[in-house]
């Protein structure tokens, strides 16, 4: 199939380079997560960049089914840390587990005026 837009590259190496050299501002959009079915109906938006204090449900991986609040969004590592997901080190200390946002579903949004404005811009209905 032919390329429709001449401005977008189909090259795998260029796509990978763009992904791994993305700035923090660009990584925010790359760290988006889908909304749950209820939220999708409520706000008429499919996915949003994930933020601290959003509540998420893990839908893939060994921690599938776990729920919790997002403690931090680690843009440098393309990961989020959820409050209830921790592993214990051999010395007894507990460390947070990093999860990619595409492997979670947002179940409750942390809304403020900026987030509501973003939903409006995306064509959704912020209530």
From Swiss-Prot:
Question: What are the GO BP annotations of this UniProt entry?
Answer: cytoplasmic translation; ribosomal large subunit biogenesis
Annotated compartments? Cytoplasm
Q: Which InterPro entries match?
A: Rib_uL2_dom2 (IPR014722), Ribosomal_uL24_CS (IPR005825), Ribosomal_uL24_euk/arc (IPR005756), Ribosomal_uL24_KOW (IPR041988), Translation_prot_SH3-like_sf (IPR008991)
* Assigned GO CC terms: cytosolic large ribosomal subunit; preribosome; yeast-form cell wall
Superkingdom classification of source: Eukaryota
Q: What keywords were assigned to this record? A: Cytoplasm, Ribonucleoprotein, Ribosomal protein
Matching Gene3D superfamilies, A to Z?
2.30.30.30
The main place the protein resides is cytoplasm
Extract one GO molecular function annotation from the record.
RNA binding
Q: Which Pfam families match?
A: Ribosomal_L26 (PF16906)
**What is stated as this protein's family in its record?**
Belongs to the universal ribosomal protein uL24 family.
Q: How does it assemble?
A: Component of the large ribosomal subunit. Mature ribosomes consist of a small (40S) and a large (60S) subunit. The 40S subunit contains about 32 different proteins and 1 molecule of RNA (18S). The 60S subunit contains 45 different proteins and 3 molecules of RNA (25S, 5.8S and 5S).
Q: What's this chain's function?
A: Component of the ribosome, a large ribonucleoprotein complex responsible for the synthesis of proteins in the cell. The small ribosomal subunit (SSU) binds messenger RNAs (mRNAs) and translates the encoded message by selecting cognate aminoacyl-transfer RNA (tRNA) molecules. The large subunit (LSU) contains the ribosomal catalytic site termed the peptidyl transferase center (PTC), which catalyzes the formation of peptide bonds, thereby polymerizing the amino acids delivered by tRNAs into a polypeptide chain.
Q: What is this protein called?
A: Large ribosomal subunit protein uL24
This protein's species is Candida albicans (strain SC5314 / ATCC MYA-2876)
